[in-house]
């Protein structure tokens, strides 16, 4: 299934929330996410712009396969055309991680982020905070037309929308996630070579 979402970088979270409130959007909540990202030895999924993500959202745990579509660069200089995403809800973060390791996958890295979620009808607006990155806005909707509508409602410049992963945002900021085994708000631990 294609994930339909765009990102706007280097946003002012307070101004975006004021705009969202003025449009009648509802604040859903503030979240702390922890995720473990997996690959096969030699990062074979990464070479296909894909990964397996296990994410604890507090109220649910989601296992996802994600793959960037229409990839032309890995450094954020160009947008992708979309994202393939297949998700299942699982009941136990640690047991699921153990299962993935037992079928031959390896830890790619562990990371954390914080998110403020707003919703207007069927459009989700996520203000994301990641270690060492400026806040950014992610808009997800059921269609590209709805994305365009959301961009217009917020008065954002459509030319500023990006279709790419957080991995690419880190690359744009001179950080290669593959160099790290752990990326949190408290520490960034380099991968052992």
Kindly label every feature range from the protein language model:
Residues 69-72, 133, 145-146:
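Short, surface-exposed beta-strand-loop junctions and turns on beta-sheet-rich folds
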Residues 1-125, 156-193:
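N-terminal strand-loop-strand beta-hairpin
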Residues 9, 142-144:
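Short amphipathic alpha-helical "recognition" segments used for binding
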Residues 144, 150-159:
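A hydrophobic, small-residue-rich beta->alpha segment in the mid-to-C-terminal subdomain
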Residues 128-134:
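A contiguous pocket-lining binding segment that forms or flanks enzyme active sites
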Residues 13, 147-148:
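Short, well-ordered alpha-helical microsegments
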């Amino acid at each position: 299934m294609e994930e339909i979402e765009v990102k706007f970088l280097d946003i002012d979270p307070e101004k975006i929330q004021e705009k969202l409130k003025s449009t009648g959007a509802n604040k859903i909540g503030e979240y702390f996410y922890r995720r473990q990202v997996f690959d096969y030895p030699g990062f074979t999924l990464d070479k296909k712009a894909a990964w397996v993500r296990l994410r604890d959202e507090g109220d649910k745990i989601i296992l996802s396969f994600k793959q960037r579509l229409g990839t032309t660069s890995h450094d954020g200089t160009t947008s992708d055309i979309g994202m393939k995403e297949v998700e299942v809800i699982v009941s136990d973060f640690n047991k699921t991680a153990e299962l993935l390791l037992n079928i031959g996958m390896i830890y790619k890295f562990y990371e954390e982020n914080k998110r403020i979620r707003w919703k207007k009808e069927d459009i989700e607006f996520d203000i994301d905070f990641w270690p060492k990155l400026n806040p950014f806005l992610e808009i997800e909707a059921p269609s590209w037309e709805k994305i365009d509508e959301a961009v217009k409602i917020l008065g954002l410049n459509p030319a500023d929308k990006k279709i790419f992963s957080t991995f690419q945002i880190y690359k744009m900021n001179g950080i290669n996630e593959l160099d790290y085994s752990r990326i949190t708000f408290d520490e960034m631990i380099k991968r052992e070579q």
